[in-house]
Amino acid sequence: MSRNLELFERGKQVIPGGVNSPVRAFGQVGGTPRFVARAEGAYFWDADGKQYLDYVGSWGPAIVGHAHPEVVKAVQDAAVGGLSFGAPTEGEVVIAEEICKLLPSVEQVRLVSSGTEATMTAIRLARGFTGRDLIVKFEGCYHGHSDSLLVKAGSGLLTFGNPSSGGVPADFTKHTLVLQYNDVEQLSRTFAEIGDKIACVILEPIAGNMNLIQPSREFVQALRQLTEKHGAVLIYDEVMTGFRVAKGCAQGLHGVTPDLTTLGKVVGGGMPLAAFGGRADIMGKIAPLGTVYQAGTLSGNPLSVAAGLATLKLIQQPGFYETLGSRTARLAQGLAEEARKAGVTLSTDSVGGMFGFYFSDKAPKSYAEATGCDIERFKRFFHAMLDEGVYFAPSAYEAGFVSAAHSEQMIESTLAAAGRAFARL
């Protein structure tokens, strides 16, 4: 028995499903999850000692590569001074200043420990600020696992209160409306009918939880115009895209100024750190200034802040995003080329350090189109690449990530492996 399988079987005895986050269980692709023993740069080594070129990168945070010496040293230095205090630190002020400097839309920011905390509190804050209850999200966009946001969409103009998880009462989600991503007409009709009742609209400005779907310019412009017109709060959930697609995040690429922004992943440099921030008048409603409550024992943890500050310093080096973007684009375009040579139908896309590939004849623009891709072919390709020592996300609905540690040679070796894998399909 392999060490990976042994650990998986042991884990299932004491951890539900053997993992601490569902996608890690290889449920969609089948087989045995790889238990990571260590990671460095663009690689990780599993419990059996096999090396993999990693395009998951901890689901996005590892933008400078695993175990970057400057990030590791920052965490080590912070640990010597204590692990947690339950009191404010200078580092919290410094990283807040850095976030506000990088994102003009963020006038004030609050640190939390997870993306779920960030989006959950941003929703609560928007409701407290507007005095309204209704929230709008989009089908296929994931915003963490708080009850109000675990809602799936159905047919028709709106879907009221359809929880997509057990244990979520319908009463918790009856104020959540689900619309179609990139559907400007539906969005406009919704605001025309009930715009004065909507507290906020939350979206992934580049959807990374239905593979990779970019919004149309018309869609993001309509979002900003309609929310402003009706007094609703526009929330850009940049937990995944924040500092991953550009130094100014997705909002900078779109030329949109949201009212609130949520951050995570990259901002913590691989440690548990997230944030929400935005307009000062909205942020002024949060406790202790206002009546909207939020708190956390480990919020602003000094080790997480140290890792985040070190990472934010590294990504601001000249040419960082130009190099990252060009290598990611080469990977995406190269995958399409290798598939074409093998006679395999494949579409690809990339933005900044994120990429997606889909076994369909065109890149999807909505959840319905994303779920129409050939999942069986994806499974075979995933395992073929795993055999080649290349680790892609074990789900057809997750974006991939390139780091600064991925060299041109690594990208080319990945494409050569993909050519062999496509030939096996």
From Swiss-Prot:
GO terms for biological process: protoporphyrinogen IX biosynthetic process. The keyword Isomerase applies. Pathway: Porphyrin-containing compound metabolism; protoporphyrin-IX biosynthesis; 5-aminolevulinate from L-glutamyl-tRNA(Glu): step 2/2. Its EC number is 5.4.3.8. One of its GO terms (molecular function) is pyridoxal phosphate binding. The modification N6-(pyridoxal phosphate)lysine is found at residue 265. Coiled coil: none annotated. It comes from the Bacteria. InterPro entries: 4pyrrol_synth_GluAld_NH2Trfase (IPR004639), Aminotrans_3 (IPR005814), Aminotrans_3_PPA_site (IPR049704), PyrdxlP-dep_Trfase (IPR015424), PyrdxlP-dep_Trfase_major (IPR015421), PyrdxlP-dep_Trfase_small (IPR015422). The keyword Cytoplasm applies. SUPFAM superfamilies: PLP-dependent transferases. Its cofactor is pyridoxal 5'-phosphate. Keywords: Cytoplasm, Isomerase, Porphyrin biosynthesis, Pyridoxal phosphate. It is found in: Cytoplasm. GO terms for cellular component: cytoplasm. It catalyses: (S)-4-amino-5-oxopentanoate = 5-aminolevulinate. It is an enzyme of class 5 (isomerase). HAMAP family: HemL_aminotrans_3. Belongs to the class-III pyridoxal-phosphate-dependent aminotransferase family. HemL subfamily. Homodimer. This is Glutamate-1-semialdehyde 2,1-aminomutase.
